[in-house]
Swiss-Prot record:
CDD domains to which the protein is assigned, alphabetical: EF_Tu (cd01884), EFTU_II (cd03697), EFTU_III (cd03707)
Oligomeric form and interacting partners: Monomer.
Entry keyword annotation includes rRNA-binding: no
Designated name of the protein: Elongation factor Tu
Organism per entry: Sorangium cellulosum (strain So ce56) (Polyangium cellulosum (strain So ce56))
Region (G4): 138-141
Domain tr-type G: 10-206
Region (G5): 176-178
Region (G1): 19-26
Amino acid sequence: MAKEKFTRTKPHVNVGTIGHIDHGKTTLTAALVKVQSKRNLAKAISYADIAKGGTVRDETKTVTIAAAHVEYESANRHYAHVDCPGHADYIKNMITGAAQMDGAILVVSSLDSVMPQTREHVLLARQVGLNHIVVFLNKCDAVDDPEMLDLVEMEVRELLSKYKFDGDNAPVVRGASLPALQGDPKWEETIQQLLSALDSYIPEPVRDIDKPFLMAIEDVFSIKGRGTVATGRIERGVIKVGDEVQIIGFKDTKKSVVTGVEMFRKLLDQGQAGDNVGCLLRGVEKEEIERGQVLAKPGSITPHTKFTGEVYVLKKEEGGRHTPFFTNYRPQFYIRTTDVTGTVNLPEGVKMVMPGDNITMTIELIAPVALEEQMRFAIREGGKTVGAGVVTKILA
């Protein structure tokens, strides 16, 4: 059978369900698909298939995360939706960014209100730079007293405000995913309300191609009579012959001009996000540039050595450490294309970190690297990955 062609008629947005165990995240995911499949805006998938999930790998290909991916459309958009079966999978997914989210659907059972994992997921969403949360108050079919629902809604809004989300204006939809999944029209309508809240509240993401140019350097070689070529995959933006770039990381930042762009040995007018290219750089000696530096649009990113990160420490079964580590631990930090040694400082009152924990830590690198908030990194020791993290704040 021929593969279905993906036709891009509507803007694409990535979302996911977050919230406490048994509050109905997977049932809601199934209901979204089911309700939209009746309108020919999704392919129906059973609850069991979503719960079974698939697996995703993070960019460093070390952390395996159980996650189900479904897709559906609203009137205006195409959504890809991720739902994780286990609490640990949510934490790993949010920290590694393996399944990206532009916004989240926070599912809260109106019978239980805010629970520990509700808080933890909202805090993590804040740490990893998710700015838009739409709330679905679930199981409203089991609550007779509307004042009870007002109370739960108030608690959820307070929680959002506490973690610097817009608790006053975030949409809160009161619904019930199980009867909606079973075809009850009254509750199916709440799924439509949720979709229109997603459409109006989560802004359309800026496409990678529209962001300022950045390419992490993977390899460098010189071409006799032409100069030095840096190769790598363009992370974002566009590069054309004649563009000025900065070479950032490890040493003093240097400026150059791109005099040629090639892909698979063919000359291009321009390279764009996702392309693997070689950039010919004017006036740069091969010795002045190395793997792990980046080429970037001047002024768009700066080198740093000190930052805080939210880190997930791999368990022994995931190939991580067997023992805890302490403040002043000195592993390698794999950032974009290279390892840089750094020193870990744990928060006050935290004596040690066990495999399987997630923790906020301060990291100081021995050499400056092009860094920005929400960037992912891996922690390695002797060539194996022992942690995965995201930059939450740049300090120096």
